[in-house]
Amino acid sequence: MEILLTGKNALVGGSSKGIGRAIAERLAASGASVTLMARSEDLMARIVESLPTDKGQSHGYLVVNFSDFPAYKAQMDAFFAKNTVDILINNTQGPAAGSALEKGIEECQTAFDLLFKCAVYTSNLALTAMQKNSWGRIINVASITVREPLNYLALSNSLRSALVSWGKSLAIDIAKDNITLNSILTGYFDTERLTQLYTQKAEKMNVTAEKVRGDMEAQVPMQRIGDPEEYANLVCFLASQQASYITGTSIPIDGGLLKSY
């Protein structure tokens, strides 16, 4: 199935590496003009240079810090004063790992800004043009821990759950405007973030990182870690006209890891 996003403008959070980068590259390959958002200007500048422009696309980037909401808000206000977005990908790096007992109120507030507040604010700004044009796509990058929490990811579990619940509520309100909103429940994917998590876990358990990664792979019915390109393919479909009747849902992409259904 060929997916064409020619003429669409996409804003992709956390897109200097990992899943976010794969999403940006896949949307651009399908014809979308993509604006990347992340902290690393050097990485984003190189990615933008590599993105295709054969379908008339124009790409760019914004250097942002999702953990600094006042600064982020000012940047988004300035961006949306001059630009419109058809496809919004709410994606950021996750908060620091740790159990609920290890996290204080300040860390909870930082995680709230990072995973929830920025996504809500950006979505509200993007919706103005989406509603005017009677077309839009909002996709939240969440986690399978929304359904089956991991105790060492207490902040991610909590705030991503809030994001998914908010997304479901908003999806009902904007469906009449031909705007879809879906959340993706992310399993294990081969990214720097995953490497960081299993390396930290290995240090706590006094075992090798390879042992922890192997145990992760063994938990997955498909017996492997996912490729970010596989993730990006799902996002590209949800961003397309072919997915026009899919909204308000949470879609796991985890190789069968979730035991619930």
Predicted segments, located by residue:
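Alpha-helical segment proximal to the catalytic Tyr-Lys
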Residues: T128, I172-D173, S244
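Substrate-binding pocket helix/loop in short-chain dehydrogenase/reductase
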Residues: S99-F112, I138, M216
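Conserved glycine-rich Rossmann-like NAD(P)H-binding loop of the short-chain dehydrogenase/reductase
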Residues: A32-I47
